[in-house]
């Protein structure tokens, strides 16, 4: 009697194991799709990390480090930019802002990535220490919101479209 129960339990366990294993087998198409999704998620995560590191480098005033994140052909455009900025002209623009607002910082508020594109909402803020476009320094903190949409190529920032709240900035 014990032998029959043992054989039945053993057979049942083998069936359960066999059934479980057949359900765990992933088709080649499913594996390929999973691998592509995983690679895309890793790319998006890396691109978001790079965007964060760019703003950290700017906040640290480390423009040489900032340069390492950009492709040689980088350009920045936007509705209020009459000419595209190259990386060199972008750094000059940031340095001019820092000359007026020595404590100027960028704070990443939100970020979304899809494929090779990252959209980031930032807040910029600082206290004006020098004249800015004819405006005398004030003791209060000034802030400006901005949206950057950046496209990557081979892990480097290739182009950025920017929209800043310059009107609110001038108030």
Stretches with model-predicted labels:
Residues 24-72:
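Short, low-complexity N-terminal intrinsically disordered segments enriched in polar/charged residues
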């Amino acid at each position: 009697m014990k032998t029959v129960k043992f054989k039945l339990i053993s057979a049942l366990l083998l069936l359960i194991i066999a059934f479980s294993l057949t359900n765990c087998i992933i088709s080649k198409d499913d594996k390929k799709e999973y691998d592509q999704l995983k690679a895309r998620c890793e790319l998006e995560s890396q691109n978001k990390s790079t965007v964060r590191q760019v703003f950290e480098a700017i906040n640290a005033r480390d423009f040489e480090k900032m340069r390492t994140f950009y492709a040689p052909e980088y350009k920045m455009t936007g509705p209020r930019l009459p000419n595209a900025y190259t990386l060199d002209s972008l750094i000059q623009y940031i340095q001019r802002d820092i000359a007026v607002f020595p404590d100027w910082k960028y704070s990443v508020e939100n970020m979304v990535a899809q494929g090779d594109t990252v959209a980031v909402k930032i807040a910029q803020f600082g206290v004006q220490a020098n004249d800015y476009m004819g405006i005398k320094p004030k003791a209060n903190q000034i802030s400006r919101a901005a949206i950057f949409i950046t496209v990557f190529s081979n892990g480097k920032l290739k182009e950025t479209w920017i929209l800043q709240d310059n009107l609110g900035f001038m108030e």
